[in-house]
Amino acid sequence: MRRRVVVTGLGAITPVGNDVATTWQALVGGVSGGAPITRFDASEFKVRFACEVKGFDAGLYMDRKEARRADLFTQYAMGAAVQAMADAGLAEGGYDPNETGVIIGSGIGGLGTMEDQHSVYLQSGNRRISPFFIPMYIADIAAGVVSMRFGAKGPNFATMSACATSAHAIGEAFRTIRYGDADVMLAGGTEAAVLPMSIGGFGNMTALSERNDSPATASRP
């Protein structure tokens, strides 16, 4: 039986705001998140600006120890998920864990962790690679960590569909509820890809704007 599907809660960690209200006001106000890259020295790169998330505090959403064992993309996912569950009135429960699932997509996953651990390997050898490297890196860990946080035991996986990843996740969640495989779904996407490898790679394939002189107006559809 096909069921009506509704959105009951929203959450957002974005380059123009770390919650839904701030993000929305920035969007309708035409505020750009573009600015020179601060996360690494991009002076020798073709592309030297990006839309970075600013002022994010993972400690608002995760235990500090848990956050240290999570790549930034997973931290962003947790922040948005906690907001969405609160917005839906489900932060304290009120849902059947067996009928609740999580689909969170990521195009690149924990690339920052990959970069860090590759440096460790080159400098100190394989025995110094963190045992947390793989679970921090894999793209489906964001969905896994969020599901553990809320005890969700329903469908749980990641989508990876390039720029359509988040929309793909939301569409899959819609169908999951519509066809009766779950009653509640947390869905969306997460990325933390302002990194040397990704900026260099996307830049060299000419997939990024090179209007470094005006980051705020570089996106021109």
Q: Where on the chain are the PLM-derived regions?
A:
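Generic hydrophobic secondary-structure packing signal
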Residues: 19-22, 26, 73-80, 165, ...
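Acyl-thioester C-C bond-transforming condensing/cleaving domain
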Residues: 2, 18, 28-37, 86-99, ...
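Generic anion/oxyanion-binding catalytic loop in active/binding sites
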Residues: 12, 70, 159
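A glycine- and small-residue-enriched flexible loop/hinge segment at structural boundaries
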Residues: 39-90, 113, 139-153
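Hydrophobic alpha-helical segments, especially transmembrane helices
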Residues: 4-5, 69-70, 179
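ACP-dependent fatty acid/polyketide chain-elongation machinery
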Residues: 1-66, 88
